Swiss-Prot record:
Organism: Bacillus subtilis (strain 168)
UniProt biased composition (Basic and acidic residues): 46-60
Region (Disordered): 37-60
Induction section of the entry: Expressed only in the forespore compartment of sporulating cells. Disappears after 45 minutes of spore germination. Expression is sigma F and sigma G-dependent.
Name by which UniProt lists this protein: Small, acid-soluble spore protein Tlp
Taxonomic lineage from the root: Bacteria, Bacillati, Bacillota, Bacilli, Bacillales
């Protein structure tokens, strides 16, 4: 293996330092998506309204999972990312 090929074999180090912030951004973006979807329901057909409601329910579940992950990552950060 040449030197160039070998440099591509090495994995990137695990950098969790900004995970909380990324997850918070994901929560905010998902909330905005819910709000935009709800606004679009005014112009949607009955079938589309049902799809939007179902998708927003899944988005709410995602937000809950993101918030749980934020708590986990925040605790890990406070513990210096030790197991």
């Amino acid at each position: 293996m040449t030197k160039n090929q070998n440099q591509y074999q090495q994995p990137n180090p695990d950098d969790r330092s900004d995970n909380v912030e990324k997850l918070q951004d994901m929560v905010q973006n998902t909330i905005e998506n819910i709000e935009e979807a709800e606004a679009s329901m005014e112009f949607a057909s009955g079938e589309d309204k049902q799809r939007i409601k179902e998708k927003n329910a899944r988005r709410e579940q995602s937000i809950e999972a993101f918030r749980n992950e934020i708590q986990d990552e925040s605790a890990a950060r406070q513990n210096g990312y030790r197991s």
